[in-house]
């Protein structure tokens, strides 16, 4: 399923369930402990999963040159919708030709290819403990040995996978278009549990304090215990969403196909604020980055929006020439984002002014990974780019 089809598919399914799908359900929930600083950002030398950390904040502690240069470009042959992971100076990314590839971070040379057998869409790899995990468009989860690209196990869901895996200890979390979030044993691929929703699980779950959080096409915000697969609570997400949730200090930030960005307090389960551009009414498919009291998100209105995390008031917007499905990343007071206009942008986090840009000439709808002073992103023309 292409990105452009997601809105129509969600709308069709949501319309059949909107009147009955959501009945608020919740179990008593103790107040959550504050997140540790390391949970809110990726380390300087790794970006091990989509958005860099369990909390999906899209923030890295690395330092990147003010005017980076193209270090290398690896030709993948087909569009990259998958976003890279970076671990131990190796880049892992899925391809539309159905491969998970490993490429050297410093030299851009291919280390190995794993053939999944079916195209890989937006599912982005997660890497931990010598294993790389990814989902494909026929609904198979793949586990691969990072040393040589040899298969370890596969697990079949009932529909395509656009969500990205999250590894927490010995558990792999994966959402599927069959409407379930799965908990799998990372070593064996055995199903530990399946949490069922009433529509697609498109976004990647963020995990804080042993609880997975995600909003989806059923217009419900879900919180699930990752050990048991039991629901902690479910509350209205107000609209269907293709974005993943970023979670900071017990507040979830995410965009919706109702043209809004929301801040949802998980303690009270109330919406703290809603942001909608006063003039441009377009959906948000991009996932938000959250850092230093600022929420940064790309919109299908062609704009990058920076919002006050407490109030939802716009701090600045920057207009590109095409829609933005790429999820921005942040490091060192800079915002890094691709646009379907073919440019990669670096903006000042405080002002929104362009610090640097690269004209690739092909849409950049995948999201960047930041590690070891480098930026890696794939284009729709099949080039995997590394800037340093």
Model segments located where?
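Extracytoplasmic beta-rich repeat domains
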Residues: 54, 66, 72-85, 110-128, ...
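N-terminal export signals
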Residues: 5-24
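Blade/loop signatures of beta-propeller domains
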Residues: 42-70
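Compositionally biased, intrinsically disordered low-complexity segments enriched
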Residues: 26-41
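Short loop/turn segments that connect beta-strands within beta-propeller blades
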Residues: 104-107, 145-148, 186-188, 225-228, ...
């Amino acid at each position: 399923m292409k990105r452009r089809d997601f809105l129509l598919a969600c709308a069709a399914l949501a319309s059949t369930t909107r009147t009955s799908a959501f009945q608020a359900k919740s179990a008593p929930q103790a107040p959550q402990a504050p997140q540790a600083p390391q949970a809110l950002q990726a380390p300087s030398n790794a970006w091990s999963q989509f958005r860099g950390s369990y909390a999906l904040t899209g923030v890295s502690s690395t330092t990147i040159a003010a005017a980076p240069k193209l270090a290398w470009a690896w030709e993948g042959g087909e569009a990259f919708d998958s976003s890279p992971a970076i671990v131990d100076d190796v880049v892992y990314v899925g391809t539309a030709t159905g491969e998970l590839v490993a490429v050297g971070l410093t030299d851009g040379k291919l280390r190995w290819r794993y053939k999944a057998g079916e195209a890989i869409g937006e599912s982005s790899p997660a890497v931990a403990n010598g294993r790389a995990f990814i989902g494909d468009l026929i609904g198979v989860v793949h586990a691969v040995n990072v040393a040589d690209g040899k298969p370890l196990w596969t697990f079949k869901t009932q529909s395509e996978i656009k969500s990205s895996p999250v590894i927490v200890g010995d558990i792999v979390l994966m959402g599927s278009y069959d409407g379930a979030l799965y908990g799998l044993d990372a070593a064996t691929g055995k199903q530990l549990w399946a949490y069922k929703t009433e529509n697609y699980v498109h976004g990647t779950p963020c995990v804080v304090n042993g609880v997975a959080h995600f909003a989806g096409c059923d217009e419900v915000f879900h919180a699930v215990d990752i050990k048991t697969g039991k629901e902690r609570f479910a509350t209205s997400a107000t609209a269907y969403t293709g974005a993943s949730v970023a979670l900071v200090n017990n507040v979830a930030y995410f965009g919706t196909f109702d043209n809004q960005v929301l801040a949802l307090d998980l303690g009270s389960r109330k919406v703290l604020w809603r942001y909608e551009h006063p003039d441009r009414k377009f959906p948000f498919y991009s996932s938000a980055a959250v850092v230093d009291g600022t929420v940064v998100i790309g919109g299908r209105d062609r704009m990058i929006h920076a919002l006050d995390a407490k109030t939802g008031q716009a701090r600045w917007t920057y207009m590109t020439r095409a829609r933005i499905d790429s999820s921005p990343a942040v490091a060192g007071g800079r915002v890094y984002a691709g646009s379907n206009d073919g440019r990669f942008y670096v903006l000042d986090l405080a002002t929104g002014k362009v610090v640097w840009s690269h004209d690739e000439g092909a849409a950049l709808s995948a999201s960047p990974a930041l590690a070891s002073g480098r930026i890696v992103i794939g284009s729709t023309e099949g080039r995997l780019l590394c800037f340093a």
